Amino acid sequence: MERDVISVGAKLLDCLSANGADPGDAPKVVVIVAHPDDEVIGAGARLSRLKGVTVIHVTNGAPREPDYTLRAGFATGDEYAGARREECLSALGLAGVAPEQVRELDFADQEASFNLIPITRRLVEILREVGPEVVLTHSYEGGHPDHDATAFAVHTARRLLEGEFTRPPEVLELTSYYSRGGQIVTSDFLPFRGYGVRTVRLSREARELKRRMFDCFVTQREVLRWFPIGVERYRAAPPYDFTRPPHVGRLHYEYFNWGIKGARWRTLAHEALSRLLNEGGL
């Protein structure tokens, strides 16, 4: 049975990696990311290959702290969140992803870590409804607490659903960012022994598509300039222990005032995992 599951993930990796016009049929995929642009950063050039894909944004991309809203040029957080959603829908539309394929859990940016239980429960419901063969999501790497919270929720939701699925969905990862020696690393993975990386060198047409998708995110231009256009990377998700740091040393988000530090995050993960497993996710 496990070989069958792995082959579905391998099939998706082959589909994402192929540079030809016809990569073949992709498995049924749900993309689950923390913010409305993370899927474009990590997989924008390949989303058009995922026919019928469902995209889930865990947060609305708007922190509650008013400074973020004002710096982005909006009077309220709701206006900022609405703009981020419209930017993302425009970008996804370029890849053939329709608005009805996109779902919002609508938690505030920087608050996913404090909502691990409700997020996991929502994902259990959605995965049960959609029944994907593969979930594409963030890795656990200490880059952004919302990214790590999303990874936690995906892995825990899959664990809670194992008894219901004949073939539980394979979890694959797209890239975001993390810190190495105090320097940001983008569009690559924190190494995990035994888990190889599929590197995709994008064609000229694919780079142009991704550039046009990036251009849709007017509010995020300063952020997106950190991410290269020419390459995307994917891998099978390792078996994480979310109660331990993803790497030694200072985590990327610990350099910023993003509402939480690593020790507190891991305490919340431990508490949420214990409660969810003891209650069966209910």
Go through the PLM ranges and name each one.
Residues M1-I32, L50, P99, A112-L282:
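Metal-dependent de-N-acetylase/amidase catalytic core
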Residues A18, D22-E79:
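ATP-dependent adenylation/pyrophosphate-handling site
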Residues I56-H57, D106, L172-T175:
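Short beta-strand segments
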Residues V58, L94-F107:
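A conserved beta-strand->alpha-helix junction
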Residues G61, F107, Y140:
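Flexible loop residues that form catalytic
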Residues F74-A83, G196-R201:
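A short acidic, glycine-rich active-site loop
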Residues Y80-A95, A153-A157:
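Short, solvent-exposed amphipathic alpha-helices that sit
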